[in-house]
Amino acid sequence: MYTHRLTLILATLTGFCDDALAQQAATLAAPPPLAIAGPEPEASSPLPVEQVVASIGRGVDFLTQSQRKDGAWGSAESQRYYGITAPIPGAHNAFRTAVTSLALVALIDASSQLEGDRLAAAQSAIEKGQDWLLEFGDELRRAAPDAYGQRRDSHTHQRTFTLYNVWGHAYAIHALVSLYDRAEGDPELQAKLKSALEYQVDRLRRCAFLNGGWGYYDMVARTKTPSGSPISFTTATVLIALQEAAELEVSFPQELTQKALDSILRQRYPDFAYAYGEYLRFHPRIGINRPAGSLGRSQVCNLALRMYGDTQVTDEVLRTWLDRLVARNGWLSMSRKRHIPGESPHFADFSVAGYFFYYGHFYAAKCIEELPAAEQPFYQDHLANILVPLQEKDGSWWDFLLYDYHQAAGTGMAVSTLVRTLHE
């Protein structure tokens, strides 16, 4: 009993110290030297604007032609093998909501580059997708308790509880904010969209982790308040979405926001690589936590912290990590489209999973927007040169096989990214 109490006291004190150090780090004047040291890629030859716009158009065509009759994108239908836990129906509600939202955001982002029949098809798809999100978006929630124990994790030997709904809530917020802006002049529709937005934000409040932030598995006590390890990039994704919701005066509890920020800061290393999750933060030099393993995470984590006032995420830090993404892109691309049945998604070098590829570039494009206008074309050209050649013959992009969700997800992210590579 004494030992148990002592352990709890030490854990509590350690948590307080960690939070204090994390908050202090966020207010320091300058980033550590390692955070602004790295490769310096040369400029790339810009692709013709017409080529990039044509690529965007083909991506839009794929999205409008692959939309389901009910207005959503993606499904659980597949004849292929996948090694990812996805208990029904919760996991698939989450996947479908997330990819539908990403497709909607992409179509809205791309609309300014479209005309004629292609523009008409995109607008029709947006209307159908909006109807679906308004009708079914409130069915997304944390998986039912019977999802507990769907499988036993081979590494921890603990029951796994999936929280994929977090991704659906976050990307639904992005879509609803974009749809709200699009509905300017229609207060009745805007009221419906804002109500749907409030639902998604409230659901994120309910599934915030005990230690702060969010993750997509709970492999510890499986309590009402998730007690597992917060995941750095999941938390950053949610925080960025919540910042967008706040612009429409949909608020989120400040104490939960601060706990989430503290969680990310606890996972940040001096080079501004980020641990995959808090459960790995005391292993700074394992592959997944080194800069090459963090290529797909550092962009989103840097962006989230900067949006919430972290003065250490300077322009120089953003440039350094964009330079890393460009110069070391092969590390991120190594597992793209290489899912091997029976293998962990993290089988590649530095444990980089395929699903980080378009995700990493999606947030890199948003980091570019944070830089001075004169510096943006250098990185815009690099991203366009990376993404355009990877487009599939059917107009899609994808990086990780996931039932029938991967093409809509990858295409949505790629289209939104390419729109941001066009010089103003």
Task: List each model region and its residues.
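Bacterial N-terminal signal peptides
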Residues: R5-D19
